[in-house]
Amino acid sequence: MSARPGLLARAEARLTREWQRRGALAWALAPFACAFGAIAALRRAAYARGWKARVDCGVPVVVVGNVTVGGTGKTPTVIALVDALRAAGFTPGVVSRGYGAKIAAPTAVTAASPPQQAGDEPLLIARRTLAPVWVCPDRVAAVRALKAAHPEVDVVVSDDGLQHYRLARAVEIVVFDHRLGGNGFLLPAGPLREPLSRRRDATLVNDPYSRALPPWPDTFALSLAPGDAWHLDRPSRRKPLAQFAGERVLAAAGIGAPERFFATLRAAGVAPATRALPDHYAFATNPFVDDHFDAILITEKDAVKLGTSWRDARIWVVPVEAALDPRLIALVVEKLRGRTSA
């Protein structure tokens, strides 16, 4: 197996660690962070003051995003929010950039779409929610295309896109993991795309260690719980995680925060060897072919990229369910029914 995935993952992990402290590297990059912050502030001000126009697509938009780099749990949050909005009487659709997708124009994503065209996260959302999902780097174009194809949709959830200021939105939800804002510096000295003080309607904190929530207004805990694993070759075959406890298990993840996946497995009683792959890892070849384990546990996001040509009977997929605080759902529904613009 090529060493490149391991090198990339280690480089990502090293940078992530540096972003959690104000060490020599962070201070060396601080001048660049100041320049980045000035440019970002100017962009925000241009839309806030009307120098540039926001586009109202004729349907309320709920943006689920983050102000930090890396995975925080946005995708399971989007899936849970779509289900909650549907239960509240809405007909939701979803738009996404489609990271890694080879598209230039708005494109519909279905459960049968190839991951190269759809992107891994939109494809997972389409399969889990069965809601209309459209992808495009231009989210305004994606919302317009979705609404034209599905006039029954009365709310659109944007998977990421917090910094896509051109798109008018009714609600903004910012998702953090346990690292919150790291060292508090903007890119490239820290993990922040925008200051922690950035205005939003609600904050979710995905902290597997269940520490106290930060004292921010309208802040809620985000709980992610694993379900029974399902077999990659035979999805109808299920296995509780506890049954892997006595086996030689490898846990592998090509997501933004792989350690969170590993911690989830440990909390369920599994003691796996671990392998962090680069985020959005393509799985062009089987990276496990030379590994000697009884079982290999991967995430749902990675599983959507493994086609029918994969024939590795050791691979099991671990789904994750997000539990949203009822108060958050009530806040979102109230804002949508009031059609308040953020």
UniProtKB/Swiss-Prot annotation:
SUPFAM superfamilies: P-loop containing nucleoside triphosphate hydrolases. ATP binds at T68, V69, G70, G71, T72, G73, K74, T75. Pathway: Glycolipid biosynthesis; lipid IV(A) biosynthesis; lipid IV(A) from (3R)-3-hydroxytetradecanoyl-[acyl-carrier-protein] and UDP-N-acetyl-alpha-D-glucosamine: step 6/6. GO terms for cellular component: plasma membrane. HAMAP family: LpxK (MF_00409). Belongs to the LpxK family. This is Tetraacyldisaccharide 4'-kinase. It comes from Burkholderia pseudomallei (strain K96243). The gene is lpxK.
